Amino acid sequence: MEKHIILLPGDGIGREIIDSAKQVLTAIASEYNHRFTFEEHAIGGSAIDEYGTPLPDKTVDACSKADAILLGAVGGPKWDANPSHLRPEKGLLGIRKQLGLFANLRPVKTISSLLYASPLKEEIVSQADMLIIRELTGGIYFGTPSERTTNGVVDTLQYSREEIERIVERGFEAARIRKKHLTSVDKANVLESSKLWREIVEEKSKDYPDVAVNHLLVDAAAMKLVTQPSFFDVIVTENLFGDILSDEASVLTGSLGMLPSASLRADGLGLYEPVHGSAPDIAGKGIANPLAMILSAALMLEHSFGLVDEAKEIERAVNDCLLQGFHTADIHIPGGVQVGTKQMTDAVLENVTTKSISDSICSSYV
């Protein structure tokens, strides 16, 4: 298989971790007789510095022609005082919108060898294994008007029926191939948009009689995530709620440095990135955890290229590294081997080409 991948290092630790993912993908291509080509472009703060905009036209053009996109991270205090249209985050929001990447998938699965790192008790978090599906291109982040007024401010939450239907269908499809349980999160006791959301979920449920559906208000869902995370299989929700809940859920694993994500459109084009931010405080120090970026590459192989075995090979290699005791600073414990970005990447590369030491291959993150 031959595929062309756009690399968007972005800001902070983005370049360090995206280089790690590129090395692992190159190793996988060699092992499985694929050919991956790479092309790098700017986004976020680095694009502002070089081109005067967080999302250059050449970046959008290249991404629109690619088979998939890997993004490191965007943002940093250097650009915090910029006007809103010149903030790094506008580059990420813009590329999602322009490419029509409407579905954000964030798998959250605790890893047995890292249970110590979770802030929750082991008996609460040990069975957590969920997929959060967040609508990405509608809602209050994109509604108009959004502006300051003479005496205040206005933001607008708006959704079309089509926007809700397509993300809800994605949720049902994901639940159907997992544990057949879909939780829809809304605020239907207050918001008109949520009332329509809930109506559409009920309508679509008739097409998926094999999937059990329940509805939770967003505040109740937030509580249940930390009191009974094993309750959830697939969560589907709108943009703002999904943004907050997915960040909350990411804490269950003990480190943002372990969590990948995918932003997809209907034809399979996807942008893949770690959940964590740009971590400017450790940029250039060689200590960033590359595993979320590497696991994001695994998601890319599975969802955009259909290379399930290759994706599982990466997941197995990451799992074996952890079982061997390799940990970056964010997940380090006494008795383990604390390593930096390069050493952890090298350990993954070593495990990609060796037989698993674990009793069973780790399950897919989705």
Curated annotation (Swiss-Prot):
Cofactor binding summary note: Binds 1 Mg(2+) or Mn(2+) ion per subunit.
Binding site for substrate: 96, 106, 134, 219
Catalytic activity: (2R,3S)-3-isopropylmalate + NAD(+) = 4-methyl-2-oxopentanoate + CO2 + NADH
SMART domains to which the protein is assigned, alphabetical: Iso_dh
Site (Important for catalysis): 141, 187
Gene Ontology CC entries for this record: cytosol
Record-listed NAD(+) binding positions: 76-89, 277-289
Gene Ontology MF terms: 3-isopropylmalate dehydrogenase activity; magnesium ion binding; NAD binding
Cellular localisation: Cytoplasm
UniProt-listed GO biological process terms: L-leucine biosynthetic process
Family: Belongs to the isocitrate and isopropylmalate dehydrogenases family. LeuB type 1 subfamily.
PANTHER family reported for this sequence: 3-ISOPROPYLMALATE DEHYDROGENASE
Function: Catalyzes the oxidation of 3-carboxy-2-hydroxy-4-methylpentanoate (3-isopropylmalate) to 3-carboxy-4-methyl-2-oxopentanoate. The product decarboxylates to 4-methyl-2 oxopentanoate.
Protein name (database record): 3-isopropylmalate dehydrogenase
Source organism: Oceanobacillus iheyensis (strain DSM 14371 / CIP 107618 / JCM 11309 / KCTC 3954 / HTE831)
